[in-house]
Amino acid sequence: MGEEFKPAIQEKRWDIGEEEKLLSLWDAEDLHKSTLDPDDPREIVVIDTPPPYPSGKWHVGGAAHYTQIDMIARYFRLKGYNVVAPFYADRNGLPVEVQVEKTYGVVAHEMARTTEGRERFLALCSEFLDKVESEIVQLWRRLGCGFDYWREGTDSPRYRSMTQATFIDLWRRGLIYEAERPVRWCPRCKTTLAEAEIEHKEDEDFIYYVKYRLEEDGRDLVVATTRPELLAGCAALAYHPEDERYKGLAGKTAIAPLYGHRVKIVEHPAVKKDFGTGLMMICSYGDEEDVRLFLELDLKPKVLIDENGVMNENAGPIAGLPVKEARRRIAEILEREGLLVKKERIVHSVPVCWRCKTPLQIIHRRELFLRQLDFKDAVKQAAAKMDFKPEMHRKKLYDWIDSIKMDWPISRERFYGTEIPLWTCEKCGAKLVPEPGRYYRPWAEEPPWDSCPRCGAPRRYLKGETRVFDTWFDSSISPLYVTRWMWDKRFYERASRNVLRPQGQDIIRTWLYYSILRVLQLTGKPAFRWVRITGLGLDPKGRPMHKSLGNVIDPEPIIAKYGGDAFRFWAAIAAKLGYDYRFDENKVKTGRNFATKLWNLARFVSSFPRPEGSPLEKATEVDKAFLALADEYLEAADKAYGELDVYEPANLIYELAWDIFASHYVELVKERSYNRSGLFTREEQEAAWATLHELLRRILVALSPIMPFVTDAIHRRLYGSSVHRQRWPDPLFTPEERRELAGKARLIVSVNKAVWNLKRSMGKKLYEPLDTVEVLVPSGIESARRDLEALHKAAIRTYTGAPPEGSEEAIPGSSVYYIAKKS
C-alpha cells in the first residue's frame, strides 16, 4: 500500500466566524501596536490616518477607504518598516455640533448663552461622539484594520494644547492677525466660513432688470442683477472698456432707484459684456467679486445684512425681512414704482454652508486671520516635493491654491472646538497670548496673569476669548501630532521623513492644502513624502451615497454575510487608485469565493509534509519554472504596492493563486505529490511537496495586506506563526534565470489549456485519457513530459521547428498539436 495522505486542515470550508477569533488573538498579541521608540533601528513610516468625523456611521465607501489605508500599512510592515498607523477621531467643529443639535433637539447658540449652558452643550457633544466613535472603532476592527487606537482625539487636552501652541507661535510671528473684513457667513450656524468650507448648489431664481437714472442727462440705464435687495449698498456701476454701448459714461454718476443715492460709473475688465445688459452693479456684498472691487476701487461699503440673515435698518423699506423675502418684496416695490423693466427666470450657482446647506451671506466681521496669500507659491513648492499617487490629483491642489483670494479666517462663533488662547485687556485693548504648553479655556477660566502686562490693569479687566478655531485649524496639524513634533523631537526628526497622507479627493482643498500650509509655516518643511488620493465611494448606480437619496449602504450586514476578507477584497479591486469606486456585491462574493479557494488549496497542500531546507535544493526544473513565474507576479505586486496601489496587487495575486497555482501547478503535480503509481522518485515527490508549500506560503504573505484573516489562519495552521510577522518574499532567481524559467512555465500553462480544449472538442471529460492521439508540444519543456502525461493521461512528445506533417493545432496560435496514433 502507498502512503496515506490526510490533510492537516480538516475543515472543508473557510468559516468567517474564525475572523472574530483572530481579532481577539491579534489584540492579545499586540500585533499592530505602534513603536514610538526613537531608538528603534527600523526605518519609520508614519501614516497620517484621516481622523474621521464621528458624526454618523460609515457607509461602504468610507469603510473601503480605511481598509485600503490598512492594506498599505500592512504592506510596509511586510517590508520591515516600523509602521505608525494610528486611529483617532476628529472630535471638533461644526459638523459635530450640527449632528448634536439634530440628535438632541437643541440649538447651540441658545443653549450656550451662559457658561453653565455651554458646559452642558459640550457634554452633549462629548456623549454623542463617544457613542458614534465606539461604533466606528468596532467597524474598522471587524474589518481587520490593524490601526493603533489612540483614544486621545482632537478634543483631548493633549491635541488641543498642541493646536493652541501653534496659534501662539504664529501670532507672535505676525502670521495671525485680527481685522474687520467682509467674510462668508452662515446665518443658521452663526459663524464665519473659510473659502474651502463653501459648497455650491444650483438654485432657481430671477434676474431683475432695474432702472438707474443718469444724473447728467436724466436718461435711464438698465442694470441686470440677481440681488436687488442690495440696491441700498450699491456704490458703483461698471461696464467693460470695450463695450461700445456705454462709451463715455466713465466718470459720470447714476442715481440708485428707490434709495436715491449717487453711484459712480467706472470701466472695468471684470465685467462680462454678455451678461444682462453689460452693466454690473457693485454692491456690498453680493459675491467675492464685489468684495474685491470694493477694495480695488476704494469704495465705502454699507452693511445691509445682519448675522441672522435679515436686512438691517440701512435697507429701508425691506428692513427686518430675511434675505430671500426681502428680494421678493423689493422687486414688488420696484415694479410698482415703474423701476423694474422685466425679470427672467434663471438657474444659477449659490454658495451654501458645507454642513447645513444654508445660503451664505457676506457680512462685515472682526475675525482672526492666518496669512496664506503670502504663502501660495511656497505651498506649491512644498507640494512639488511630494509624491502624489496618482499624479493627476496634484493639479487639483494647484488649481485650488491659485483660486485663493483672501487670508484664512480661523475664528468661529461656535462651541465644540479648540478655544482660541487669547485675552483682551478692556482698559488698553492689548491682545494677550499665554505661554504654550497646556490647554487653555479662556471663556471658562481665570487669565494666567495677575494684571495686564501692558498697562497693569487688574486681572478682572482681562476678558477671555469665547470663540473657537475653525476645525481645519486643528485637523491640519495631524501630521505633526502623529510624528510627536511637540513632545519628542528625536522621534519627529526620524519619523517626519516618511509621512504618508491617505485621503479622499473631496478634501484636497481643505485637509491636504491646510496641512501643507500649516506644517510649512511651523517647520519650514514639506508635510508629506507621499500623498495618496482616492476617489469617492458610490452606490451601484454610480451615485454618491446620501440619506436624502435613500441609497446609503451599511457595511455591517455585508460583512456579517460574506466576512471581512471578502469586503476587503472588493475594496481592493473596486477601482484603480484615484478613481471613484462603486459598490458591487458580486465582487464581494468573488472575495468570499477566493477565500474559500485559498482554504481549499491550503487544505490540499496540508496533506503533505513540508521538507526541510530550501525548496530550490530539491526542485525539479518544472518546479523551478513555476517558482520563477511566481517571482514575476510577486515582483509586479511588490512594485504596485510600493506605488501605494492595492488594485493591481489584488488582481495579480488573485491570478497567481487561482489561475496559475490552483489551475495549473497543483493539477500538474498532483500525481507526483501522491505518487500512487510509483512513476516518480522520492526526491521528485518531495520536490513537489516543497514547491507546493513554498508557493502557498508566498501567496499568503503577498495577499495578507488585502485579506488578513484567511491568510493568517492558514499560515498559523501550517507554519506555526502569524503571517503578519513575516517579511515580503525575496526573489528566488536572478532576472536572467527567472526570464528563462518563467517562459517554460507559461509554455506548460499553454499546453494544459490546449489539451483541455482538445478533450472538450472530442467530447471527453478532462480526467479521461487521450488514447487515440498523440500530443505534440514545442521543445524546451522535456522535463515536464512525465508530469504532463500523468495529468492529461496522454502520450506527449516534443517537436523542434515545424510541427510534424499531418498534425492539427489544438488551439489556434498555441503551438500545441495532436496527431492520430498509429495503430
Curated annotation (Swiss-Prot):
Location of this chain's protein in the cell: Cytoplasm
Keywords: Aminoacyl-tRNA synthetase, ATP-binding, Cytoplasm, Ligase, Nucleotide-binding, Protein biosynthesis
CDD domains assigned: Anticodon_Ia_Val
UniProt EC number: 6.1.1.9
GO BP annotation list: valyl-tRNA aminoacylation
Any single Gene Ontology cellular-component annotation: cytosol
Primary localization: cytoplasm
GO MF assignments: aminoacyl-tRNA deacylase activity; ATP binding; valine-tRNA ligase activity
Residue sites binding ATP per the record: K547
Classification via Gene3D superfamilies: HUPs, Isoleucyl-tRNA Synthetase, Domain 1
InterPro entries: aa-tRNA-synth_Ia (IPR002300), Anticodon_Ia_Val (IPR033705), M/V/L/I-tRNA-synth_anticd-bd (IPR013155), Rossmann-like_a/b/a_fold (IPR014729), tRNAsynth_Ia_anticodon-bd (IPR009080), Val/Leu/Ile-tRNA-synth_edit (IPR009008), Valyl-tRNA_ligase (IPR002303)
Catalysed reactions listed for this entry: tRNA(Val) + L-valine + ATP = L-valyl-tRNA(Val) + AMP + diphosphate
Classification via PANTHER family: VALINE--TRNA LIGASE, CHLOROPLASTIC_MITOCHONDRIAL 2, VALYL-TRNA SYNTHETASES
Function: Catalyzes the attachment of valine to tRNA(Val). As ValRS can inadvertently accommodate and process structurally similar amino acids such as threonine, to avoid such errors, it has a 'posttransfer' editing activity that hydrolyzes mischarged Thr-tRNA(Val) in a tRNA-dependent manner.
Domain notes: ValRS has two distinct active sites: one for aminoacylation and one for editing. The misactivated threonine is translocated from the active site to the editing site.
Family named by the database record: Belongs to the class-I aminoacyl-tRNA synthetase family. ValS type 2 subfamily.
Protein name: Valine--tRNA ligase
Organism of origin: Aeropyrum pernix (strain ATCC 700893 / DSM 11879 / JCM 9820 / NBRC 100138 / K1)
